[in-house]
Amino acid sequence: DDWLTPWEPQRPQHLLDPTRDRDAFTSRCHARDRDRQMGVAYGFGLFVGGRFCGEVNINGIVRGAMQTATIGYWIDRAEAGHRYVAEAVAVLFRFAFEELHLHRVEICIVPRNTRSRRVMEVLDIREEGTALRFLEINGTWEDHVRYAITAEEWDERAANFAAQWC
C-alpha cells in the first residue's frame, strides 16, 4: 500500500520493516520507550473501534530557552477524513502545553499533502511559511509548509479546543 509513501522519509535499506518483522517492531518500541523516558519524544496510538489505525507523535523536544517540539501523525487510509487526526492533534496540543509545559509546537507538511494540511485548517493553526528543502522524502529534499501554535495561543484557545475536540 502506497498510502503513506509520498509523505514519509525512506527507511534505510539496512533496517528491517517494523510492520513486517517482529524483532524490528520490538526494537522500534524499545527506542520509543527510551525517547519517552528521556523526555525527547512521545508517541500515541490512534484506535477506532478497538483497531489500531494510526499514530500521533511529539518529537524533537528541545528544552532550555526554546521549549519547543514538532508533531507528526499518520492514519490508515480507511479511517482518513473522519477528523480522528484533528481530534488526536488537539489532545496532543493539550499534552504539550499543559503537561510538558512547552512554549511552541510546530507541524511541517509537504505542500501537496492536502489532507494533512486540512487538519491544520480545521484546527485553525497558524501557517508560518515554507521551509525550502526541509526533509528528504523518497530521495528528494521536499519543501514543507510550517504551522505552529504557541503557549500564548493555546491559553487563549484551550477552552474552545476542549469543547470541540478534547
What are these regions (language model features)?
Residues 1-2, 100, 124:
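Structural motif
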Residues 72-73, 81-83, 101, 129:
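Alpha-helical hinge/cap motifs
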Residues 1-78, 140-166:
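GNAT-family acyltransferases
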Residues 12, 111-112, 135:
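Positions that flank functional sites
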